[in-house]
Amino acid sequence: MNYRWFMLSILLLLTTHVQCQMVMPQALKAGDTIAIISPSSSPDSMTVTKGCAALREWGYKPVVGPNALKDYHGFAGTADERAADLLWALRDSTIKAIMCSRGGDGGVQVLYRIPLEEFTRHPKWIIGFSDVTTLHSAEAVAGVMSIHGSMCDGIAAKGERDSVNAILQRLLRGRLPVYQVPRHSLNQLGEATGILLGGNLSVFSGLAGSDYDFLNRADEGLILFMEDTHESMSKVDRMLHQMEIRGVLSKLKGIIVGHFSKYKYPENGFADMYEMLHEYLQHYDIPVCYDFPSGHHSRYNFPLVIGGRVHLRVGQDSTRIEFIE
């Protein structure tokens, strides 16, 4: 046997094994620093100010990235400037977590400017949703967990969002969430345990075939979470077909469907997005939870650990989602 080829094969096996083991970033403590960056669209400065105030109330020290408030053709600076802020937040040892100011567009421009090894070397919670799915995907491929959750506007909100923010605060301190939500008439019953990956459907669909495509890990037994906004039923249908053609859907162990908002309905005879999704997903013998309160919603965006091991039980009366150490 060729010795060099043998050693290369062993190295590849070891690398694959390491990547399958998702790393949980360290829990935060009072006084820790959280960086606020803008990897996508330019944020409203007042929203960032309110987000900083909320983090201080939580007991943390917020620090805003050098380019986070810039506006360059709608983005928060050039792609290089946004990438520089992310690298700064990852590499600075005094920064313990990273919160994105907002989503929007443009996160994909940052991805190929950041070597995946940077996420592995500096495992930190990256918090956000929507277009921040790009960073969740990169961390997942690099073997690091992240948080699909509220950003500056969400954490600054009071009233109905208090319960959501309380869960995010506990999660940052190391307490994994357990959710029990009411049944939905379209739910598919069953139980499954696997690694939770996902986020904004249109964003992670746009990464298909790239080095940042977490669906390449479908063989590992994934539970997929998806949500979206401003996408028509026909476009979502096309994204599902794309996953089916790739052979991804048949490998999933379960699906959690979050909020789908701001789309035209009824369309093509379907009353709403969930009905269209059910028409498609009912042919797979896996548990499916509909209308989980996470994603683009004016009130509820409960945090999820992307890359975390989760037990999903979809029962007759309710759905239980428990993250496992």
Give the residues covered by each predicted segment.
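Short Gly/Thr/Asp-enriched flexible loops that form oxyanion-binding sites at enzyme active sites
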Residues: 103-121
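Conserved beta-alpha junction segments in alpha/beta enzyme cores
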Residues: 33, 42-48, 54, 191-231
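Internal helical hairpin/lid segments
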Residues: 215-273
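Short, acidic/small-residue loops that bind anionic groups at enzyme active sites
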Residues: 116-139, 145-151, 287
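Conserved anion/nucleotide-ligand pocket segment
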Residues: 145-212
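Bacterial Sec-dependent N-terminal signal peptides
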Residues: 1-22
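ATP/nucleoside-binding phosphotransfer catalytic cores, i.e., glycine-rich phosphate-binding loops
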Residues: 262-325
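ATP/NTP phosphate-donor binding region
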Residues: 20-94
